[in-house]
Amino acid sequence: GIENLTWTPEVLFAGNTIRNNRARGTLFSTPKKTVVEDNLFDHTSGTAILLCGDCNGWFETGACRDVTIRRNRFINALTNMFQFTNAIISIYPEIPNLKDQQKYFHGGKDGGIVIEDNEFDTFDAPILYAKSVDGLIFRNNVIKTNTEFKPFHWNKNRFLLERVTNVKISE
């Protein structure tokens, strides 16, 4: 696929309340700087934050290279199953043949995607799913488990990573 990089935006998504959305809370897909901070993700039906990109189905833009997700609060996100709902935060490019992929899709540098200082208040296990990432940091986040809903998700892992390198995970 071809992407016009001169038409891609930088994104500052800050101070919002995202509540009761169907399918997902937010979707970001730009190679420029993306900052998601100080938001409340409250009962988003699908994944709260999706970093996507593909030339296979939706034909959305390409890779995310510089993403910071910080100081957000996630309350019982992922209460339903839709496309791209592998975790509360899903880094999920559409790659039909992952094992033969030559380059990583997202990131591309140490700390290309940083998830820090967030609070997850959740009834189920999956917090982060990442596929085809070079440079992922998850640090200083608080994960609290509640009993508001019965856990149901097929993904029983806090962190599920597929073809990810240069990863640092610490709660």
Model-derived segments and spans:
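Extracellular parallel beta-helix/beta-solenoid repeat domains
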Residues: G1-E171
